[in-house]
Amino acid sequence: MGTKGKVIKCKAAIAWEAGKPLCIEEVEVAPPKAHEVRIQIIATSLCHTDATVIDSKFEGLAFPVIVGHEAAGIVESIGPGVTNVKPGDKVIPLYAPLCRKCKFCLSPLTNLCGKISNLKSPASDQQLMEDKTSRFTCKGKPVYHFFGTSTFSQYTVVSDINLAKIDDDANLERVCLLGCGFSTGYGAAINNAKVTPGSTCAVFGLGGVGLSAVMGCKAAGASRIIGIDINSEKFVKAKALGATDCLNPRDLHKPIQEVIIELTKGGVDFALDCAGGSETMKAALDCTTAGWGSCTFIGVAAGSKGLTIFPEELIIGRTINGTFFGGWKSVDSIPKLVTDYKNKKFNLDALVTHTLPFDKISEAFDLMNQGKSVRTILIF
């Protein structure tokens, strides 16, 4: 392409300060350096994490910043040493790297990478490239990256270990969802919770991640899937995707965990918390059965005070586990998930409620914050 080796000017949505609305600006995107790839983003989606970051509810984030981490695009150019992609390839940028060298990447027990193994402040990870500089500038000032992806920019630069090459015929307006929400929820049920055929499950939170977890539970063969959300308007879609029961805690006269225990005659086999608040986490654990109940934490809620538990809650046989990116070995697994989508093994289309031009990103955030959307796709 004629832009190879040159600075590209394009539009991006910048968060100049914490708690302030995004501003669409013209930014300069520098050429990729060694082991870096510059991508033209075709489609990007909104995730609640992006909104949480913009609202300054994550500690350690540096501003100004270009957020966004759920997208798909086309390789524009590559830096020296890049061998896994070439210009023109369709790709999905990934906040979960795979270096293939560290003890985490070499272990079958985890999908973490040493690059981000310290997740005390996840939003502050990968805000600069390997040489500790940014590839973005605006109005003469450097602009920070986000999660190593920064997909709210028409062009972005990522490390070659944060990138999955996908099939040439992939629909980028759908497979962009594999960059975070779907992969996280679906994988949590299959890879982390390891939901079993005939089991009973409870999924707390029916946003994009929660609905994906419902699909994962169904794919794993669960016989009963209880969806829980404070927005009853989400129940129709949840049932269409596999939920057998739906409960709104605000409509109940006793705690949700007590209701679930009564419904299931003792508690569910698997609970998946896709909301992340302290009360929801506790309810998810409490609604699991004694003996073998499993609770998987997926969501990270801003301002959560954590979870207080007592030993006797676990010594009766319950287990707690967490998930990062649904347990997928990112760069290796995403191409396979793209193929599975093409083969209709799961339904990404059902998660897409709106498609808007990128310039209407503020409208997309309003839809999400008002609970009127599941996933909105923004097109450049």
UniProtKB/Swiss-Prot annotation:
Top EC group: oxidoreductase
Q: How is the cofactor bound?
A: Binds 2 Zn(2+) ions per subunit.
Which of this chain's residues are annotated to bind Zn(2+) 1?
47, 69, 180
Q: What is its EC number?
A: 1.1.1.105
Cofactor(s) recorded for this entry are:
Zn(2+)
Has UniProt tagged this entry with the keyword Iron?
Answer: no
Activity regulation annotation text: Oxydation of 20-HETE is inhibited by low concentrations of N-heptylformamide. Oxydation of 20-HETE is a decreased by 55-65% by either all-trans-retinol or all-trans-retinoic acid. Strongly inhibited by omega-hydroxy fatty acids.
Q: SUPFAM superfamilies this protein is in?
A: GroES-like, NAD(P)-binding Rossmann-fold domains
Q: Which residues carry this modification: Phosphoserine?
A: 121, 278
Q: Which family does it belong to?
A: Belongs to the zinc-containing alcohol dehydrogenase family. Class-II subfamily.
Task: Spell out where the chain crosses the membrane.
Answer: none
- Coiled-coil region: none
Which PANTHER family does the record match to this protein?
ALCOHOL DEHYDROGENASE (PTHR43880), ALL-TRANS-RETINOL DEHYDROGENASE [NAD(+)] ADH4 (PTHR43880:SF14)
Protein's cellular compartments:
Cytoplasm
What role does this protein play?
Answer: Catalyzes the NAD-dependent oxidation of either all-trans-retinol or 9-cis-retinol. Also oxidizes long chain omega-hydroxy fatty acids, such as 20-HETE, producing both the intermediate aldehyde, 20-oxoarachidonate and the end product, a dicarboxylic acid, (5Z,8Z,11Z,14Z)-eicosatetraenedioate. Also catalyzes the reduction of benzoquinones.
**Any Pfam family matching the protein:** ADH_zinc_N
Any other comment in the entry?
A: There are 7 different ADH's isozymes in human: three belongs to class-I: alpha, beta, and gamma, one to class-II: pi, one to class-III: chi, one to class-IV: ADH7 and one to class-V: ADH6.
Q: Which GO terms describe its cellular component?
A: cytosol; nucleoplasm
Q: Which organism is it from?
A: Homo sapiens (Human)
In its UniProt entry, what is this protein called?
All-trans-retinol dehydrogenase [NAD(+)] ADH4
Which amino acids does the record list as binding NAD(+)? Answer: 48-49, 205-210, 229, 234, 298-300, 323-325, 375
Write out the GO MF terms.
alcohol dehydrogenase (NAD+) activity; aldose reductase (NADPH) activity; all-trans retinal binding; all-trans-retinol dehydrogenase (NAD+) activity; benzaldehyde dehydrogenase (NAD+) activity; NAD binding; NADPH:quinone reductase activity; retinol binding
Binding-site residues, Zn(2+) 2: 99, 102, 105, 113
Known partners and oligomeric status: Homodimer.
Keywords (A to Z) from UniProt: Cytoplasm, Lipid metabolism, Metal-binding, NAD, Oxidoreductase, Phosphoprotein, Zinc
